[in-house]
């Protein structure tokens, strides 16, 4: 009798929690859709904070859900895009700590480095990019991380001049590999 009562209680809790999860997912989807329809609002820090709150709230409530790390990654990206670097890094660090087996963990490390870079925190960016490149040398973003490292702290004009100055060398090297 006790087992049946426990099973019934578990079933009730499962059913009670499921709509909450679905409701939360619907709220996230609706918010994301509104932002997609109005890209200007996506750059608004208040809008970014609201969306981040939804993502983080989902991860808090459903930490074992496979979408929890996905939403944390999105939350970190959103905060990074509005230059809330400290908050972005906190979220990325939480993701790294809580979900070490997350399939997109390398992207989390890259985005963390990029958040520092975008906020002109070059020492932190350098360390984070170097970590990423050494840990994930074959990741599709490794080349971008190396380019960012090579141009860390440069103005856009300086970066362009450096890239153009080395463009001929790159083309010659690529052509010699073909021969």
Where are the regions a protein language model picked out?
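Acidic, polar-rich low-complexity tracts and alpha-helical solenoid repeat scaffolds
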Residues: 16-179
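Sec-dependent bacterial lipoprotein signal peptides
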Residues: 1-17
